[in-house]
Each structure stands twice: as C-alpha cells, then as structure tokens.
C-alpha cells in the first residue's frame, strides 16, 4: 500500500471515530454513583444529588425557603463549549419546600451541566454562583 493510500485510510478512520455518537457506556464512565450538590441564595437553599442514568444527567432534591420572596432553581448545559439556554426547573414563593427533578440528555466528553438558585422566576439576573453537576 502506498504512503498516500495509508494516509487516506488513517484520515478516514479518524474521521469515522469522531463522527460516532457518545454511548450510554461513555456517560456511565463518569460514574453512576450519586454525588451531592447544594446551592444557597438569600433565604433559599437547593440541595440534592446528581447521577447518570444511561445518557441522561439526573439531578434531584429540594428547594426550600425560610423567608418571603420567590426563588427558582435553574440549570444549564454546555455542549462543545456552547452554552445552551438556562432552564427554570422549580420555583417556590414564600416559606416551604418543593421537589426538584432535572433530567437532561448528556453526551460525553464535550458536555457539562450546572445548577443555581436565583431570585424570582423570570431570569437568571440575580443568582448564586453556578455549581457544576459533572
């Protein structure tokens, strides 16, 4: 086989490997064990665990508030260094607690997820620092 042919075969093989989608096994490689997370802002606190189920990133827990005002839990996934939109997952107004359940498709190795608590429910203008879920 000529050097040119070997180079062409190597390039095609590499391109094929890059085109393959991530598999559930890739996500499981990160760890299926539950990992705790916690975010607080003002009188609100969100806490729980995250884990991988196949190709899904799952975060579940509780958003609690001991004071007045509304607070929301938001998540955001970044894929290939491009942040997706922030998604509101739970809102609580006044004292009490509500469940939080987040399930997002997750493809390794170029994806990250993060979570925060924000004042109000309209946007992410006033929030606690984002916490990584991965």
Positions of predicted regions on the chain:
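Post-signal peptide N-terminal regions of Sec-secreted extracellular proteins
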Residues: 28-134
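N-terminal prepro-regions of secreted/extracellular proteins
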Residues: 1-45
